Swiss-Prot record:
Family: Belongs to the bacterial ribosomal protein bS21 family.
Gene from which the chain derives: rpsU2
Gene3D superfamilies hit by this protein: Ribosomal protein S8
Region Disordered, residue ranges: 54-78
InterPro entries: Ribosomal_bS21, Ribosomal_bS21_sf
Protein's UniProt name: Small ribosomal subunit protein bS21B
Family matches, as NCBIfam families: S21p
HAMAP family registered for this protein in UniProt: Ribosomal_bS21 (MF_00358)
Length: 78
């Protein structure tokens, strides 16, 4: 993966690199390869992730239909 450094702005180049790596899923893959995961553990983890995704989609669907209140937006202070 290659990132251009413009005007010696290394911080910006690092941000761009991190964003690209996040989008490509490299961080998740690195974490997964740190140690061996048994196939049974992998199945359990993937099933739990699928359940979480399904619940999240159902919650969003109910919010769109007006059955649940919309989530409150966090107030950011600087």
């Amino acid at each position: 993966m290659q990132v251009l450094v413009r005007d010696n702005n290394v911080e910006q180049a690092l941000r761009v690199l991190k964003k690209r790596m996040q989008r490509e899923g490299i961080f998740r893959e690195m974490r997964a390869r740190e140690s061996y995961e048994k196939p049974s553990e992998k199945r359990v983890r993937e099933q739990a992730e699928a359940v979480r995704r399904h619940r999240k989609l159902e919650k969003k669907k109910m919010q769109r239909e007006g059955l649940l209140p919309a989530p409150k937006k966090a107030v950011r202070t600087r």
